[in-house]
Amino acid sequence: GGIDLSVGSMIALLGVIFVDMVGKFGVPWPVAILVVIVIGTLLGLAHGLLITKLRMQPFVVTLCGLLIYRGAARGYTGEATAGFPFGANYPALEWLTIGRSLGVPHSFFAMIIIGIVCWFLLHRSVFGRHLQAVGKNEDAARYSGIRTGFVITAAYVICAVLTAVAAVYFAMFTRSVQPSSHGNFYELYAIAAAVLGGFSLRGGEGSIIGVVLGAVLLQELQNLVNLLGIPSSLNFAVMGAVILAGVLADQQFNRYRAKRRAAIALGVLNRKGSAPRQAPVAIDEIR
């Protein structure tokens, strides 16, 4: 499995582009959203091709992306904050992103819709089964006829597209984007939510429902830190402890499962070895 470390920096870069297109250049917001998604798609495609065609390590590719996108966002704005003009209103866009219906934020509905689509894609489609197979063992998946290069590239494209959508929501929520800090450590939040939701860092295991619950649990942990009066500066320490605990639990679970499989296999062999053999029939008895 691979981890995309460029998520936070990509949110900053795409957020700056979106805010400037809508607020500075007057581009209609549906067009701006489409452009941001296209840019995100191209960035994800670049990640996938570098990993599959040039055989670069996902960690190296996405780490370089983290640095490049953050630097590009800061260079584009000249370290200035990108924001919407004072008093500017975008009723339809604001209703879609930060509005509420029946007291429920529309971002929650967006999360549910995206979660359902991703659940179907991962658990009820051929691509999802191929993705899990590649995550467990890329070589075995390749030998079984799966187009591993396509699957890996598609995974990074999907990740980048979802990051582009998140960039729009975050930009509308904050109303401004500070390129040096916007989206900082968001990739760690994503990793922590996935680990809490039962995803294996080894790849090939996990569920969409689990990662949604993991994201909810992570937010509740942050709220608990605030309620307990723990300084907000320790949020990252709590997050690191959560990730560490999740990794340790994942390793222990994998060891337990391996021992259980070995015990079952040994039991099957023992039963076969102890099966009664049919006594040979004497020729005289047949006569």
Name every feature range the model reports, one short phrase each.
Residues 9-13, 30-38, 60-63, 108-113, ...:
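Hydrophobic alpha-helical transmembrane segments
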Residues 1-25, 49-56, 191-194, 198-208, ...:
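Single transmembrane alpha-helix segments in multi-pass membrane proteins
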Residues 143-150, 221-287:
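Cytosolic-side transmembrane-helix boundaries in multi-pass membrane proteins
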Residues 66, 70-71, 110-121, 156-167, ...:
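Hydrophobic core segments of alpha-helical transmembrane domains in multi-pass membrane transport
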Residues 58-124, 151-154, 173-182, 259-286:
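Transmembrane helix-bundle core of multi-pass membrane transporters
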Residues 163, 174-239:
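Transmembrane alpha-helical segments in multi-pass inner-membrane proteins
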Residues 25-31, 96-108, 178-185, 227-237:
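Interfacial loop-to-helix junctions that mark the boundaries of transmembrane helices
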Residues 27-36, 41-47, 51, 100-178, ...:
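Helix-loop-helix "hairpin" substructures at the membrane interface of multi-pass membrane proteins
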